[in-house]
Amino acid sequence: MGLSCRRMLARCVAVLGACCVAVTAQAWEPSKPVQFYVPAGTGGGADQMARTIQAIVAKHGLMKQPMVVQNKGGGAGAEAFLEVKEKKGDAHLLLITLSSLFTTPLATGVPFRWTDLTPVKMLALDEFVLWVNTESPWKSVAELVAAGKTQKLRMGGTGSRQEDHIITVAIGRATGAQFTYVPYKGGGEVAVQLVGGHVDTTVNNPIEAVSHWKAGKVRPLCVFDSKPMPYPEKITETMSWADIPTCKSQGLDVEYLMLRGIFMPAGVSAEQVRFYVDLLDKVRATPEWKELMAQGAFNQTALEGAEFRAWLEREEERHRQLMAEAGFLAK
């Protein structure tokens, strides 16, 4: 190879190298504030998780643009779902989801499915715990069920035909206990209503009731999971999350876990999805996130890509069956 050819080849290599650097430098990232929708009211588990993510991203400088959390809980989340559905291709919009992702369209017939969105990542699964006021006479599942067979107990929850309501119906079917379901705007409000004695019992998520448990205002009876929660640190002087027995071990054969996942509108690119997957992985590695997981006793299952989509397919069908059994499907 002559000198001139070698020089030309060297120049080509240099140009290609520069192009690669330019492509790397131009990897997609948000160019304006990212709107972060919560399809539920303030103070509940989804709201707390979204605001924790927002704070972690800001504190650790994980993204150049800020996150702006907005609560859009109208219609049991339908307000948020339909708005995100309409914003195809908007990569500056995130949605944190509950299992209302399935229950709301199935119960109301609203024209929406999770397939109208782009799944980004499952962050965790949220537990449900059966709670009573500490001033109540019920110290076990058996005592609560016995009371529910002689009188209708008021069960507080976060929405008609939603997750809490499904569990309430399942408890009644499994035990013969009777409940009057009283819906509120969010899990935070439900916990306050239990503390105030306005309802007899709830099936709140741990993070929604933990402050009241620490204060000695509410008592956990069981967790609706197949195994105890793996968090041994004491929350009260005598109990940790791990000390709460499973409902099945107490004779109540009902299990239910709730999705905590992140979605984007349809029509976004794989590169844009990858940006947020990587961002959320960085969030999950922080001490603040680990503290949230322990405080809220979350099941830390995390999925993305094809695994997440397969899980969503299965859960949608499971919810269809559960809601059919409860008589909750839209007609």
Q: Where are these predicted regions, by residue range?
A:
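Bacterial N-terminal signal peptides that target proteins for export
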Residues: 1-16
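N-terminal signal peptide c-region/cleavage motif recognized by signal peptidases
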Residues: 20-24
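Hinge/capping helix and adjacent helix->loop/strand transition within the periplasmic-binding protein
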Residues: 83-92, 105-189, 247-249, 259-292
